[in-house]
């Protein structure tokens, strides 16, 4: 079986988005199997309730896809990688809390602390960051969901030290650059190998296009080195 990459889109996006198609095409042309998935309430997947659960349920979806590759397609876990963009990168990082059937992950402008992300987004939109607290309580009381239960830190700490590749646009105004700093610290604290490519002139996931040639070379090399032949 060829090395296989699961590709995960961002919020309100789908497997048909230009970013997912571009990254998937690069990987496919380089000899990888590619499975671009739709998270629940996105694209062709079931519309469960129309709510985004900060990766809590979405990581169930990514874990189910990875486990399906192992259990139904007989692809060894050491041949499977995951690549996610934006909030799909958050889901990618959370997947390790649900399954260990993968060997490496790559993420593009990943949020790491969801609470911080929401507060920053509220401020960006002109709302008081303090509104996050009632949103969190609403999710717990009326939706029965703890939006901060499964975090990248929890997943990485309990994982198999799968290496991480990060692409980060330093001009990102939606997922601020400190999230990548936080991820680097989490990885280092847990003895996980992490490689970062940071771009001072790029915004949110823009380096996929602005540094497309470098992106292709780096991600292909990363997965070839960290997935078994």
Give the ranges of each region predicted by the language model.
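Short beta-strand/loop motif that positions the catalytic acidic residue
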Residues: 159-160, 166-168, 172
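Catalytic active-site module of serine/aspartate enzymes centered on a nucleophile-bearing elbow/loop
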Residues: 210-229
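Alpha/beta-hydrolase active-site loop
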Residues: 52-73
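Conserved alpha/beta-hydrolase "acid-adjacent" motif
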Residues: 173-179
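Conserved alpha/beta-hydrolase
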Residues: 24-46
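Catalytic histidine-centered segment of alpha/beta-hydrolase-like enzymes
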Residues: 174, 202-213
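The serine-hydrolase catalytic nucleophile loop
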Residues: 11-26, 39, 178
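Hydrolase active-site cap/lid region
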Residues: 94-145
